[in-house]
Amino acid sequence: LVEQITTVVKDQGMPIEMLSMIELDIKEELLMKHPERALGQLEKLQQLGLRITLDNFGSGRSSIAWLQRFPLTGVKLDRRLVKEIGEQKADEVLGAALSLIQALGYTTIAEGVETQQQLDFLKQKGCDSGLGYLLMNPIPENEIVSVLHQRDEQRA
């Protein structure tokens, strides 16, 4: 993977420094399949400047020991955890997971935010950002560039 990314960057004539603008999402199940091998690859990707986010956290067999060793910048909480917000036990578990991720210094992103109750809970617990239909509908591929331009114009 490291070689493939490096090759694409060189082939496109992209300055290597631009890699710091790219965030790579890696699924939890992939990292936990061979964590030792994954750690070595993640360290190389980090050295290239890539930001690395663990995707689908809570959907598989995460290990706190590995979570603290991986050179991550963020963790995306699986939508199944977010869906259960409002149930006391689920709220406690999700709150604890957010506290743990934040204690490790990673940004937190919640996937599948579809209700105001979910958004309010996540804000209260200090979740950094969210993804879901409540916040924005999926954008068709052919409209992405114009939506990004509009967003940039609104920020200016």
How does the language model describe each region?
Residues 9-13, 101:
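Conserved hydrophobic residues forming the short capping helix/wall of the S-adenosyl-L-methionine
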Residues 12-19, 48:
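Short helix-capping segments at alpha-helix termini
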Residues 4-8:
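A short, hydrophobic coiled-coil helix within the histidine kinase transmitter core
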Residues 41:
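Conserved functional hotspot residues or short segments at active or partner-binding sites
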